[in-house]
């Protein structure tokens, strides 16, 4: 679980306007923060298959949001993946 201060910082740094909490950019950034926080857990606990299912669900949801953003506005998509360091 992400600390509320970290979550607020992620929202603030990726928001398109002052009160923006639901744009695809913010949602992808929050999912990325949660995924990055869970990744070390699975390095230590390789047999946690129930938790891994939740992680894969988050990755899938992030992928769908990125696909949506790419189809709607490719410039915002490329800026977001560069900012989050998702693709090479």
From Swiss-Prot:
InterPro entries according to UniProt: Ribosomal_uS15 (IPR000589), Ribosomal_uS15_bac-type (IPR005290), uS15_NS1_RNA-bd_sf (IPR009068)
GO process annotations (BP): translation
Gene3D superfamilies attached to this UniProt entry: 6.10.250.3130, S15/NS1, RNA-binding
Name by which UniProt lists this protein: Small ribosomal subunit protein uS15
CDD domains in alphabetical order: Ribosomal_S15p_S13e
Organism: Delftia acidovorans (strain DSM 14801 / SPH-1)
GO molecular function, one term: structural constituent of ribosome
Keywords: Ribonucleoprotein, Ribosomal protein, RNA-binding, rRNA-binding
Quaternary organization: Part of the 30S ribosomal subunit. Forms a bridge to the 50S subunit in the 70S ribosome, contacting the 23S rRNA.
Keyword Cell inner membrane on entry: no
Annotated region (Disordered), positions in chain: 1-23
Biased composition annotated in UniProt, kind: Polar residues: 14-23
Family per similarity comment: Belongs to the universal ribosomal protein uS15 family.
GO cellular component, one term: cytosolic small ribosomal subunit
Biological role: One of the primary rRNA binding proteins, it binds directly to 16S rRNA where it helps nucleate assembly of the platform of the 30S subunit by binding and bridging several RNA helices of the 16S rRNA. Forms an intersubunit bridge (bridge B4) with the 23S rRNA of the 50S subunit in the ribosome.
């Amino acid at each position: 679980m992400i600390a509320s201060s970290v979550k607020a910082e992620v929202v603030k740094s990726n928001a398109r306007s002052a009160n923006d909490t639901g744009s695809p950019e913010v949602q992808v950034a929050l999912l990325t923060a949660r995924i990055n926080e869970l990744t070390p857990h699975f390095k230590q606990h390789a047999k946690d298959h129930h938790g891994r299912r939740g992680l894969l669900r988050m990755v899938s949801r992030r992928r769908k949001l990125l696909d949506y953003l790419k189809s709607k506005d490719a410039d915002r998509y490329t800026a977001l993946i560069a900012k989050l360091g998702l693709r090479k």
